[in-house]
């Protein structure tokens, strides 16, 4: 959205903690953004912008800085498509316009709604810049090669083909990968780090925060492979780091400064310690705080080093690709625009 890492734009997860107030809050409010979006900059230069997201939690971030009173911007979610208005989204009566009802949030249909809307917007609204954000529900539930997963990608491929017919530059990428994180019996494979630290030290000496946390618990039950730990007593950092290193299947344990400089994270939105689990393991806080009732399939999740690699697919031959530099998903618009020139 910004062409920059989270150390610049400030959004470093779904969820973060403010030690000053003791609040744990979702990062879906534009006030947490520290950089303008590419969409805002193009809009201000006179371009037409179309943004469609599956989950409504992203909509206000995507549409930040846009105005919807001059018919140059459209921004809505599939999840709340029936609530879109001209004043707030640049479009109304979305479901009638698209000929599709509001999809179930935990379904393939949520992403198909986004893709179908993208095709129709490209044909009718003709934006200069368009961003389509699907949901990872299917990827959380079904491994590659599964019949349901194959059906999803056949649907996705169909719409990419329709978009490609419109003589546009397309980049397909992802925010993260996905790995199986369950035991042989199908139950989640998790280290409940808050419980561990409460027993190892005094209770509540440490505060474990999981940035993957969001309201969509059916996806992953807030179990991912990344955690950050806040300590009231900063003199205990080394002893807590050493204690976490003793845990089998925790493969990265870094201080705040080490972790933020290594992974381009904003230090003031990270705890005193950053850790990541191994490939097939997740990190939880306290076992009794996780709602796992929606995990009807074996857990698949993300957040660690093993889910960093993502696809980066262009429908055009990329010009001036600098192979000496690491390519990131936030480079998508640079190369999409490069391909359009």
Residue ranges and their predicted role:
Residues 2-143, 225, 236-239, 245-252, ...:
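His/Asp/Glu-rich, glycine-adjacent segments
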Residues 57-63, 138-142, 179-182, 187, ...:
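Short catalytic/ligand-binding loop motif for oxyanion handling, primarily in non-cytosolic enzymes
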Residues 151-195, 275:
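Metal-dependent active-site segment of extracytoplasmic phospho-/sulfohydrolases and closely related
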Residues 65-68, 145-148, 185-191, 289-292:
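Short secondary-structure boundary/capping segments
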Residues 177-228:
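Acidic/histidine-rich catalytic neighborhood
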Residues 18, 211-341:
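Active-site neighborhoods of enzymes that stabilize oxyanions during catalysis
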Residues 129-133, 171, 274, 313:
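Structural motif
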